[in-house]
Structures are given as C-alpha cells and as structure tokens.
Amino acid sequence: MKCLRSVRIFLLVLCFGSVAVPSSFGWGSKGHRIINRLAAESLPSDMPAFMRTPDAINEVEYLGPEPDRWRSRAEPELSAEQAPDHFIDLELADLIGPLPRNRYEYIADLYAAGLTHPKMASALQPDRVGFQPYITEEVWERLKSAMRDYRGLSAQNQDTKPVEAAILFYAGWLGHYVGDGSQPLHTTVQYNGWVGPNPNGYTTDHTIHARFETDFVNANINTADVQPLMTPLKTIGDEWDDYLAYLRHTNSLVEKVYQLDKDHGFDGAGTPEAKQFTAERLAAGASMLRDLYVAAWVKSAEPVPEWHEEAAPKKDGAAMPGSPAANRHEVPSPQNLAALGRR
C-alpha cells in the first residue's frame, strides 16, 4: 500500500508539477442565485414557515454569491483567508487517505504527507489543496445550531426574529459552497486548463473555467431550465459522508467538461448537450442544498450530548493531556519548540 501511494505521488509530481491556487469564482453570480433560489423554493411544508416566505427566499437567493463578494482586492486578507474554501483538488487530497472530518486533522495529514514526500510538499500545502468540504460542514453545523436555538425559543414563546435572521444568513452562506461543489472544475487540479499528459487534446488555456461557469451560464441558462431537473427530496444520513459522495460524483464529470469544451459546447449559444449538462449540474447543487437544509432542521431536534468535565480522563487530579479541559493549557517545552524550529 505504501509503495502504491508512493507511485501515485510520483506520477502526480510528473503530471502536475507546481499546482497553483484556483482564483476563479464558482458558477458566477447568476448560477449561485439560481441554486439558492431553487433550494429555498422547494423546501417541504414541514420546514419552518418563515423560511418559505417570499422575502426569505429572496434573501437566500441574494446570499448565494456572498462568499465571492468577499474575494475583493479591497479586502486582501479576507480574500486570501477564504479563497481555499471554494475548492478541493481531490487528486491531491486523496493522497492522505480517507479525509478526516476535522479541518485541523486534515491540515496535519497534508503536512505529514509533505514531509514524507518532499517533492510534493508545495502542492500539498492546505491552501493549495483546498477546504471545500470542511467549510461546507462547518457552515451546515452553524445552520443546525441556529435551528436548534429557534426550536428552543419557539418552545418558550420567546422572540425568534433574531435567530430567524441568523438561519437565513447561514442558509444563504451554505448555498454558495454546496453550489461550488456541483461544479466539476472546483474538485480537481484540472481546474482551469488541462495539465499533465493530454492525449485527447483538451484545452490548456486558462479561460475554460470562467467560460463554462460564468459566461455560458449568463448567456444560456435560466431558472426554468434548471428547476425541472431537480431530484426528489432525499434523506441525508451522515451529512459528511453524503456530501463527500456528492463531491466525488461531481469530480467524475471533470473530463466531460473538457470534452464539451473541445466540441465548442460553451462557445456562444453552445450546444444542446452542453446546456443540458450545465443545467443538470446547477440542479444537482440546488437539490443537495435543499436536502441539507432539511437535514439540518431534522437533526436540530436531536438532544445535545452534555459535556461533563469531571468525566475527562484524569491523572493525579488533573485533566489528561489531549482532553478538551487540558488542550488550552498545554505548552510545549523549550526543547520541543527548538526541535520544531520555532525558536
């Protein structure tokens, strides 16, 4: 197994060399607004009524492109911080094995892989590989938390307007990343022009990303093209596993994008096949987003496990290192800091 992984990494070094951070925006404003609107409009009747009002639907739609509004040169630190949230290069991420659910474990695994395979260290920097499923999970959990608060306030006959505003913001914010996850070029090192061996002669220019997700959508795709292609409501089991499966299906369509582009499918009015494919991708994003909204609402009713600090493992009366009670107080020794090259 270790030998196989070494071969895979060697091939990636040959094929991809230095991998840059994608700078293209997902779907463009129009595509993101379509995804968010359709998800909000298709909520079932047992979802909270305030989420199904025309004003709420309009707000969720408006917020679809919100994270792209944070990618302005006027706010360079914000832009740099959240740019990797829009994509994940699965060919690189999968080199660490099964993706852990925790963002920081993922970062540590990428760092360890870079130490083991120095030639890949630059390409395996976390901001180059991307955090797409991590930001999605984290915003989904924010939404679920706010929905739990809404349930509690409603049960106590208290004012729910503030938490309703929070829920709509999280719902709109979540929609952006779920939408990005339906765009194949947001899941691959082949994000903006084919790199490495290219026996099929796919484009290597750096315009395919915007040509597909923005220019073509703006000119040729409308809500009415997408809505009929949405799938029926699906019950989400484990949201992390289901979302990764969704990303992997999206990734399986990367070459299809390049094939359509080679056939001039995204030029001007494009081809019927390209229009159908693009509408299907947007519909997949809207369907998954709706399903995640419903899952957050259903799971917000589940009891929250209580944390009992006294239940943490103890040693000589103190919390064991590694427990939540101890983590914030752990300080590396000077010797360890020196070994890490941090002095």
Residue ranges of each PLM-predicted region?
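Bacterial N-terminal signal peptides that target proteins for export
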Residues: 1-11
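Bacterial N-terminal signal peptides
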Residues: 9-20
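N-terminal, motif-rich segments that launch catalysis or mediate targeting to/interaction with membranes
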Residues: 24-173, 184-283, 290-343
